[in-house]
Amino acid sequence: MTDDVVTTQRSRGGMSEQRRRRVRLEISREAARLFWAQGVDGTSGDQIAEAVGLSTRTIWRHFRSKESCAEPIVAQSVEWELATLRSWPLHRSLEEHFATEAKRLVSEISPSEQADAGLGVKMIRLAETEPALRTAWLMACDQVERELAAVIATRLGLKPDGLQVRLHAAAAAAALRVINEYVGAGLLDGTDPRKLGDESFAFIADAVRTATGGAVGDPVQVDEAPAAPDEGAADRQE
């Protein structure tokens, strides 16, 4: 978005996209806290608005329902994984890359980011019994699958929308969903976060390798990376 567009929006009483995201995330934080403390059924839109310091009308301008208020904080809970997958260099194995990024995360994560991660874990736990929150979690998992498709396509030299890539991405994303739920449950049950963190990185790498039949996980030599074939022709041959 250009500065001119942002300025025009503001002059007309509008809101920049960056500001809109910040407001939605703040609403989501307070909604998640209330959902965890008193349940989804026990929480109203008016209570969420009061907790954030906004009008109820403003809440409904940003969200279609009170349950959908959880979506930004749930999506935030997988953002580190998505960022790590996006930045995975061809010359590194998945294990090496996750180990490097995990060390950086520990040194750079802010208190607010830690708090958001904790709220995300709690919403994922609530999603086990709250269908509307389950929708928010599955939406986040769908985004992981889409990002995985792009990563896998790059490493295999295939098209992101090809059948083989989509199958690999779907299987790997399902495995990552289970790992996230397992790790989150462990954290809420009091398991040492350091132990779970080390386990989860190993689980993720192993899950991606297993889900893709070993096709993804190893380093890729740039000068040996395969060129993208005509996948339609390959599918027809099969």
Regions found by a protein language model. Give the residues of each.
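Amphipathic alpha-helical packing segments from all-alpha helical-bundle domains
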Residues: 124, 131-156, 166-170
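Hydrophobic/aromatic residues within well-ordered alpha-helical segments
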Residues: 23, 77, 98, 102, ...
